[in-house]
């Protein structure tokens, strides 16, 4: 009893600390260290100091696992092996979270963490049991390590075919691709045109047909696995007999499946059957990659207007909570649609034999509203910075290209119509802010103020409730 009371007192004291501030600061530290390293002469193939704004942009893009790049020739041609290692490290840290990685290495040295550290880390990684947070963090690291090693081994046949007699280069490219795909980063070492064929990408164009489709297929699998949430992976592959899946797992799997299949079908209508040139495989890849990955098998500038609009919808949704993906998350959209249909039918909000509170609905709607506000602000800012700077850069209408870029940045996707290398300094800063906000989530920033408000103790009272007309 005494121990339980002591634990309760400790938890109340820990709640005075703000884990969200630590999360934000940890990402900022990684970004600035990474940007400095990318600027170094031995990180650039030119052997000269790199442009700091470009280095900062790529540090943000990698740490926020986005994939947008201002390098005209791509990171594979712009960065040396050292620079590529720095990028890969930031992708890995950004996908898992700096606090998660740091906790793992600390526990290798110390067998136990202090109560304060366990509580804070549990809040940051989303663990519901702070007592077992170390075990949970180790599971996250182990899952990532296993998936990335398997992905590297699966990808080796492609790279050994592309680089005969160069096994070390093949292994490095396969490892980088596996880590980038699993963490939904969208970076590769092939050039500036991702996986698009017939546009002058020497690596992609040199691949036999089987190798190309093999590469794209296993990339899609890694993207999906990385975006469905570590909690779902643990739940599905926990190998515990007679244990039912959590409602969270069912919601994530159902929503993910619906979005993938519906996305495939809609892209077939807008860009497959519509005469825009996408084949069946490319429309499937488009449906997968726009959920925060950033790889592409088709020139995004050539996608129809309807395809771009639907693509923005997918980018806004993103992946699932506690995954390597960005966006407002699948569970958020699920909750909003569930609440809407429940309201129309005059029934309580129920799914998978569970009832959901109004607080969850309000939180989901707040997240969507904050996300849309960030997107609108980003679009206005970039439009002001660019003015007529982008005229003639892309075939697409400039405003459409900017909207696509803004959604891509906020959703930490990384696809682009091709305007990224041409944008001005101000626009680069705006995109960096959008990528940062998209990776951490608007609610992370909102929670800082919410936590500070909760700390203020005062006289509690309530106003009289009153309804007014809506709609």
Walk through the language-model features, giving the residues of each.
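Membrane-proximal intracellular helices of multi-pass ion channels
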Residues: 1-471
């Amino acid at each position: 009893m005494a121990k339980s009371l002591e634990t309760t007192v400790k938890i109340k004291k820990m709640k005075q600390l703000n884990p969200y501030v630590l999360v934000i600061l940890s990402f900022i530290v990684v970004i600035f260290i990474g940007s400095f390293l990318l600027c170094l002469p031995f990180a650039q193939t030119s052997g000269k100091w790199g442009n700091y704004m470009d280095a900062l942009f790529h540090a943000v893009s990698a740490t926020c696992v986005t994939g947008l790049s201002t390098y005209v020739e791509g990171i594979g041609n712009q960065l040396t092996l050292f620079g590529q290692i720095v990028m890969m490290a930031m992708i890995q840290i950004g996908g898992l979270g700096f606090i998660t990685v740091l906790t793992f290495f600390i526990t290798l040295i110390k067998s136990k963490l202090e109560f304060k550290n366990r509580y804070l880390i549990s809040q940051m990684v989303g663990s519901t049991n702070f007592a077992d947070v170390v075990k949970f963090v180790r599971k996250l690291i182990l899952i990532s390590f296993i998936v990335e090693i398997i992905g590297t081994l699966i990808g080796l046949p492609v790279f050994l075919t592309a680089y005969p007699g160069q096994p070390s280069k093949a292994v490095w490219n396969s490892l980088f691709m596996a880590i980038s795909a699993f963490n939904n980063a969208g970076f590769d070492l092939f050039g500036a045109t991702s996986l698009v064929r017939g546009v002058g990408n020497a690596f992609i164009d040199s691949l036999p047909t089987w190798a190309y489709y093999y590469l794209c297929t296993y990339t899609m699998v890694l993207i999906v696995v990385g975006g469905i949430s570590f909690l779902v992976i643990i739940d599905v592959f926990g190998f515990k007999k007679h244990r039912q899946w959590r409602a969270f797992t069912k919601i994530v799997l159902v929503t993910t499946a619906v979005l993938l299949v519906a996305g495939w079908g809609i892209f077939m209508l807008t860009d497959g059957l519509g005469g825009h040139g996408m084949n069946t495989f490319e429309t499937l890849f488009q449906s997968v990659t726009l959920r925060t990955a950033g790889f592409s098998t088709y020139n995004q500038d050539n996608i129809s207007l309807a395809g771009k609009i639907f693509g923005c919808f997918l980018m806004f949704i993103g992946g699932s909570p506690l995954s390597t993906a960005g966006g407002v998350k699948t569970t958020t959209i699920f909750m909003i649609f569930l609440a809407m249909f429940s309201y129309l039918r005059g029934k309580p909000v129920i799914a998978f034999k569970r009832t959901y509170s109004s607080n969850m609905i309000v939180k989901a709607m707040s997240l969507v509203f904050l996300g849309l506000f960030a997107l609108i602000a980003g679009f206005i800012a970039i439009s002001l910075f660019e003015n007529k700077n982008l005229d003639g850069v892309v075939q697409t209408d400039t405003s459409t290209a900017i909207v696509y870029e803004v959604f891509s940045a906020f959703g930490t996707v990384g696809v682009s119509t091709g305007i990224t290398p041409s944008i001005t300094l101000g626009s680069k800063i705006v995109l960096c802010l959008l990528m940062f906000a998209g990776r951490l989530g608007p609610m992370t920033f909102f929670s800082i103020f919410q936590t500070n408000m909760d700390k203020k103790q005062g006289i509690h009272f309530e106003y009289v409730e009153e309804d007014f007309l809506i709609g």
